């Protein structure tokens, strides 16, 4: 038993989620014991942001865990996570997308990705501008990458107290998502 009631905390969060929403439990910096407790309660999707920590956890925890890589990913680190990562949640360049495709192919896998948008008005955030993302999709090179599947978009709102600013940024992201889905992914769910 750990000093944190993982099961209680997990169930409190799960009770608040709408139908159809899957929780990605952020496990970075948390010991394997906490992850195992969440796993024992039925949680199967976990998010990590450091490849060394992820490698250790993959080796010691159940092999049916679905691992997501969250946060900024350097191109030279893709080869270390490609054997076991299910999704990369922050793809911020065509160069990174190419490397993910290359490393996924080397591991005979398809890796899901989310294209990261930089909408927040903070220099500390990564991502593609809407115009850059639109251009990446329009150019179509991603369609020739059989080992990568663009599963959606992600963005981080500005870390501010101004709820109106956050709403505006989320509205921009939602509107762009609708545009992307209707223009490039009409045959997908």
Language model region names:
Residues 1-189:
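Conserved alpha/beta-domain cores
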């Amino acid at each position: 038993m750990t000093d944190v009631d993982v099961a209680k905390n997990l169930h409190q969060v799960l009770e608040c989620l709408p139908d159809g929403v899957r929780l990605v439990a952020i496990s970075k910096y948390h010991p394997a014991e906490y992850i195992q407790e969440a796993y024992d309660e039925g949680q199967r999707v976990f998010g990590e942001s450091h490849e060394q920590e992820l490698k250790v956890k993959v080796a010691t925890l159940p092999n049916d865990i679905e691992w997501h890589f969250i946060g900024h990913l350097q191109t030279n680190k893709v080869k270390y996570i490609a054997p076991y990562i299910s999704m990369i949640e922050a793809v911020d360049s065509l160069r990174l997308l190419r490397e993910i495709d290359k490393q996924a192919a080397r591991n005979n896998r398809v890796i899901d990705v989310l294209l990261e948008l930089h909408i927040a008005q903070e220099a500390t955030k990564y991502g593609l501008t809407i115009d850059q993302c639109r251009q990446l999709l329009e150019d179509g090179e991603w369609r020739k990458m059989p080992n990568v599947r663009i599963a959606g978009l992600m963005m981080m709102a500005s870390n501010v107290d101004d709820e109106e600013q956050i709403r505006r940024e989320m509205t921009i992201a939602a509107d762009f998502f609708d545009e992307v889905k209707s223009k490039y992914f009409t045959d997908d769910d």
